[in-house]
């Protein structure tokens, strides 16, 4: 099967890759007439042309379009609460997220809290609401991604920053998997090279982290196939998308790859790279951070023989005769797309931050236990420190 076939069979939601503009207008007609709330980035919606698409679809369906664009690159609790209040006040027939992962995550969280009646803070955690109300039927967001990275259009996750505690918090909730996602690759053409690089690396990390997560293989029979297809598409097309933003074939492939990556982590989750970089928001682009951390985490995983075998399955994509050579080949790919070689070259990542990262990461028992090679809690700070220091110094050449 190819990427469109995998995506068409995505469980639990509709992801439209063919005639998405018509599908959006039809969805508004089905739900309307009424109000449509569009959550967007501050400038990206105009730059990519997406806001015009929404206006046209709403007009064709006889719906009033209400736009909210005051969403930070790292959305904070107060912003999501404002979005939640807007949903409650306007009672829309549809909520649309047009943007990158930050916009989609914020909209998913706001839509959930607006309907649950719970304070937003009570949703942080895993299936907090759906475990209490398994029969609830909630309206879900329509997602239109304008980047090719997070795969939030296909996940049950929402990451929100709590400035008071200086941490990014996670909602993992099956009720926020988007009801409908529309993939319109043309909307990603306006991404500058740096954003293309960072988001593409995030998608690549999702696919590889999920593929290496051998303990979660039973969660969905096709997840590893999705991961391999995502990795293949990214290794072939990310360099082209960075070099030429209007390369339509490369942008199409990257859109598919990002969504496949989201589908992968929905069932197999991320690992230590995401854990270790969770508090680095505002200091280093998320996709760059997880990609840089992956080689050192991957080497730790090799202590699990099943990960050794899984690693060698990637040798057609990252050539090597041993697991170490495969990892080195992956790092060479990162070099080829301009990812820094070492954290010491990243001004925002200080030694003090790395020490705090090891201490805080050592408290995340669930993430440590579910890593492809579980991290013993008693040794977690030492192991995370070693991974972080290796990434700080960079791979030996």
Describe each model-derived feature in a short phrase.
Residues 204-208, 254-262, 276, 294-297, ...:
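Short alpha-helical scaffolding segments that buttress acidic/His motifs in well-ordered protein cores
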